[in-house]
Regions:
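Bacterial Sec-dependent signal peptides at the C-terminal "C-region" and cleavage site
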Residues: 15-25
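Second-shell loop/turn segments in exported
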Residues: 36-44, 62-76, 142, 164-177, ...
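Noncatalytic luminal/extracellular "stalk/propeptide" segments of secretory-pathway proteins
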Residues: 47, 54, 58-160
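Extracellular/luminal Protease-associated
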Residues: 75, 124-216, 401
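Acidic/histidine-rich catalytic neighborhood of metal-dependent amide-processing enzymes
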Residues: 168-175, 179, 256, 278-375
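Active-site-adjacent substrate-binding region
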Residues: 252, 358-488
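C-terminal non-catalytic alpha-helical accessory regions
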Residues: 464-465, 473-716
């Protein structure tokens, strides 16, 4: 009897530990993929996401100006928001919460006004100069679109110029601003007559400036501009412009706010992010993204999710603007994060899932932009994985998966260029990847980006869909990067005729590219097979097999991350803002210059101007056509000046080399109506440019051919 009681007593003592074992993290390893996804979808709370976004967009303590908002890089409001977000991360239970300090230029919009004949008109600034406290009182002069031709016969020295601008069809505010400064104006006000801010005639707009601080530069509503212009024919009209705008070069600090859910292993990680700096109130752009990221974190924590890898949640500062005197002045916080603060994240990060404006229904469908190597992953996750959420109450045509190349307009590109596989929800371009969604013409970067634009069904879907994508990437034993997409990209970049004209070895290039396909296909097959077997083991509840497959997948993960980093280092170029294979820049320029020459030889400058001249150097020759050489000198120095090469951010080492055709572009445009003119001088400029571009093409192709050969070995 004593022995029986002793055994019973020992069993009773052991019972609590047995119960704890069932509730321990080890228990979560036995949760099936279906139950994991079901639990996350149930816990994903779009209303929590909305509450975060709403506070960020409406709390005046988190904005620099009580009337129009604004939370610019390095500003007091951005710092206050960083504190709030770090506190919220701690409150919901994330670990290792940190405000990672990064360098930026500081911009803080405190306020501005423009008064004409006793009427005060609202204005909003760019990251440009302030006025003295008492303001600038000066005559107002209307100069059309603000090109150098609009100033002919007009004296604007010391005056305030008023221009119309369409920053989509024509040019960025930078160029009329620099032209106004060059012409001696004291300040410039721009009315958005097209392109942006079309939601209302009192809409104001702000953008990154892609230039120096220059002169005071403000957006003014179209209605206000019309009222002021109506007074000008009746005599001199004085205006008083007051701008309280802090722009401090090299003196700013932005914070990237991070927290994490620690995985069973910290060798690799998955990153979810958005940015919290804003123009105006920025509810969609990008307060909603911050809400989504924190809601995903909270849902994972609430279900006790123990990932295989670390899940890092990173809210970036200084996305909208972060540096003066550079073409690449946006996504500065993210660039600093991956290149300066955490370069070790390259080769460690399985994916960066970035978010922009995730609570607005842009179209009847949605997409994901990504690195080409991720097209297959996204397609399989969306169309073949059994646990992927489907849109409900939004996007009736579903998620399109044809593959959409990530662009330069969001933080994910900084990570992508550094070598991190990256995505962003389809927020900007329509499926043709050429035209923007109407939201960008109407609401984007205006005071009308408010909670009134919120769509809960879209937020709920994006939260569930991308949260499930993060779980999918975490749970699969092998990272599904597909280098057959890189093969296709490289193959499609070949123009055999231009290669032949340039003396580049098209046959060798084609041969090396074709040699890339078999190892890329074989690697893809290995990854797909491993992941398929893992899914089968999960369905069968075979934990031992799942563990074995995970171990087998680790070397494959290291291999594909190494190859991905290599691809971006040697095979990614940038033509102004457009991702390319490096040789495509000279290849394209040669073709365009030859078309122009053909037109000029047959005395047809009008066709040359209408179809070709402005498109050389991506679009930069359109600026050469319309703005003074001094303005273009500033543009050239920002991009290619020897003293500014450490100020290029995501354009560092991948920006294209411009063809020197500026004088010819301007001359052909100015002579476009001539019939039978002699264009020998201009033809010579374009021919010299072709000769130089042929040299660049041969050099690029040589480097690429060598790099592709090494890539083939990395994949084998």
């Amino acid at each position: 009897m004593f022995i029986f009681l002793l055994i019973l007593f020992v069993c009773i003592l052991l019972l609590p530990s047995c119960a704890r074992a069932d509730e321990s993290p080890a228990a979560h390893q036995r949760r099936s993929l279906q139950s994991l996804h079901d639990a996350f979808s149930s816990a994903a709370n779009s209303q929590y996401a909305y509450s975060i976004a709403h506070r960020l967009a409406t709390d005046l303590h988190l904005h620099n100006n009580a009337t129009y908002g604004g939370r610019q890089a390095g500003s007091d409001a951005e710092h206050a928001a960083a504190d709030y977000l770090a506190d919220e991360m701690r409150r919901i239970g994330l670990s290792d919460v940190e405000k990672a300090a990064a360098k930026c230029d500081k911009w803080q919009f405190n306020g501005a006004s423009f008064t004409v004949n006793g009427t005060e008109y609202p204005v909003y600034t760019y990251a440009t100069a302030s006025t003295v406290p008492e303001g600038i009182t000066a005559p107002i002069v209307y100069v059309g679109r603000g090109t150098m031709y609009d100033y002919e016969g007009v004296d604007v020295k010391g005056k305030i110029v008023l221009v119309d601008i369409d920053q989509r069809a024509d040019w960025w505010i930078t160029y009329p601003m620099l032209e106004a400064e060059h012409q001696g104006a004291a300040a410039i006000l721009a009315a958005n007559v097209g392109g942006f801010g079309q939601i209302a005639d009192d809409a104001l707009n702000s953008q990154d400036i892609c230039g120096p601080t220059s002169i005071p530069t403000c957006s003014i509503g179209v209605r206000a501009s019309r009222e002021i212009r109506a007074q000008l024919p009746h005599g001199t009209v004085l205006g008083t412009l007051k701008v309280d705008n802090t722009v401090e070069i090299g003196k700013g600090t932005t914070y990237n706010v991070t927290g994490r859910i620690r995985g069973k292993s910290s060798e690799f990680q998955i990153l979810l992010g958005g940015h919290y700096d804003t123009h105006f109130w920025g509810f969609q752009d990008d307060c909603c993204a911050v809400g989504l990221v924190l809601a995903a974190a909270k849902a994972m924590l609430d279900i006790g999710f123990e990932p295989e890898n670390d899940i890092v949640f990173c809210l970036h500062g200084a996305e909208e603007w972060g540096s003066s005197y550079t073409q690449f002045d946006w996504t500065v916080g993210a660039w600093e994060m991956i290149n300066t603060l955490h370069p070790e994240w390259v080769g460690k990060t399985l994916a960066f899932l970035n978010f922009e404006l995730p609570a607005y229904e842009f179209a009847t469908y949605t997409t994901t932009y990504s690195a080409p190597e991720m097209f297959s992953l996204l397609r399989d996750f969306t169309t073949r994985y059994p646990y992927t959420p489907k849109p409900q109450g939004c996007f009736p045509d579903g998620v399109l998966t044809e593959g959409y190349q990530t662009y330069t307009y969001s933080d994910d590109f900084s990570y992508y260029a550094a070598g991190v596989p990256s995505t962003v929800n389809g927020f900007l371009l329509q499926k043709d990847m050429e035209h923007v969604h109407p939201f960008y013409i109407d609401y984007y970067h205006t005071q009308y980006d408010t909670p009134d634009t919120y769509n809960d069904a879209v937020m709920a879907f994006n939260l569930r869909y991308y949260g499930a994508l993060a779980i999918y990437i975490d749970q699969m034993p092998a990272l599904q990067l597909d280098f057959t997409a890189q093969y296709t990209r490289l193959k499609d970049a070949l123009d055999a005729d231009i290669f032949a004209q340039s003396g580049a070895d098209a046959a060798l290039y084609r041969s090396v590219v074709e040699s890339l396909l078999p190892p890329a296909q074989a690697l893809k097959a290995r990854i797909d097979t491993l992941n398929a077997r893992y899914l089968a083991a999960d369905e069968a509840g075979d934990i031992a097999e799942m563990t074995r497959l995970r171990q087998a997948g680790r070397p494959l993960i290291r291999k594909v991350l190494n190859a991905f980093r290599y691809c971006q280092k040697y095979l990614l170029g940038l033509m102004y803002e457009r991702p390319i294979v490096p040789h495509q820049a000279p290849q394209e320029t040669i073709a365009l210059c030859q078309h122009i020459i053909d037109c000029l030889v047959r005395h047809d400058p009008a066709t040359a101007v209408d179809q070709y001249v402005a498109t050389v150097n991506n679009c930069l020759e359109s600026y050469s056509i319309y703005f003074s050489p001094a303005v273009i000198d500033t543009l050239n120095d920002m991009n290619w000046g020897a003293g500014n090469q450490d100020n290029l951010y995501f354009g560092t080492n991948i920006n294209f080399d411009k063809a020197e055709v500026e004088e010819a572009s301007r001359s052909v445009y100015q002579r476009r109506a001539e019939i039978g003119g002699d264009f020998a001088k201009e033809i010579r400029v374009y021919r010299d440019a072709i000769d130089m571009e042929k040299k660049k093409l041969r050099a690029d192709v040589h480097k690429e051919t060598e790099a592709i050969g090494w890539l083939k070995d990395l994949l084998g």
